[in-house]
Amino acid sequence: GMVTSRLVDGPDGHGWTWNKDPQLGDTLHRNKGEYLHSMFSVAHDHGFRTGLYASKTKFSLFDLSWGPRYGEPDPVGEDNGRDKIDVYHMKTRSENMVDDLEKVLKKEQAFDLLMVHIRNPDTAGHGFEWNINIPSIYMAAVKKADELLEDIFDHLEEPAWKGRTFVIVTADHGGPLGLKEHGDNQNPENFTVPFYVWGPGIPAGADLYALNPESRLDPGTTNPLPSPGTLPPIRNAGAGNLCLDLLGLPPIPGSTVNAAQDLKVR
């Protein structure tokens, strides 16, 4: 959802519910029955350099779907090719993956659009339960993820990146205390996730709902379905279109979350 800015279900949803590595020949397009655009395809078609650094093998789905074989021909201006993700890099240890990323970030203009996936909290929650007591395996994993984010932010303070880089931090789900699964989509411990945005011109400590009183509504402890005439909550699926908006690019074709690119962050 984050990369397509679509919800899962419904005629406009991306439809992918398989939570394992893709099988031979699997793509988001084949599963949906039609081509699905993404933030990677829009950015790449406009000549932007894209990357995906991940710590789970299942993210190969994105590289397959928008790679040189299944990516759609570039319809915008100069032909930038069918491979919409210039660099796909996967290491199962987040620490090793971020180490590799840090080496790349030392190069000016390494990427225009980059997605980084850190697996530690999710792996600990599923393996040992969501436990916010200290000490716990889960909180140790959260601490490690925080340290890895700090490493990335340190590099973004370098002159090549400072003052012209935006960062969005979010998650795909939460987790109920004392459990290892998150299947109940009406439990706020499952659907409440962080959505932080940093970058030039973004006011420190501002609340995104306060910045968007006419277009977004805090759902509190409810998980509302999309409904005409009702303001939606801020959804993590809006991240893809927000990234493109911050880059000065149009929304993802066929997207339904933040499709108007009206989520204000500054």
Language model: regions and residue ranges:
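Active-site His/acidic residue clusters
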Residues: D63-R82, E102-D151
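Polar, surface-exposed loop/tail segments
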Residues: L249-R266
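Active-site nucleophile/metal-coordination loop of metallo-enzymes that catalyze phosphate/sulfate
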Residues: G1-D45
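A substrate-binding/cap region within the structured catalytic cores of diverse enzymes
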Residues: D26-Q109
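Substrate-binding rim/cap in mid-to-C-terminal beta-strand-loop elements of soluble/periplasmic
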Residues: V3, N185-L247
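Metal-dependent active-site segment of extracytoplasmic phospho-/sulfohydrolases and closely related
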Residues: K144-N185
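Structural recognition of the beta-strand scaffold that forms the well-ordered cores
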Residues: G1-T4, F40-V42, R49-A54, L61-D63, ...
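Solvent-exposed loop/turn segments at secondary-structure junctions
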Residues: V8-D9, T50, K56-L61, R119-A124, ...
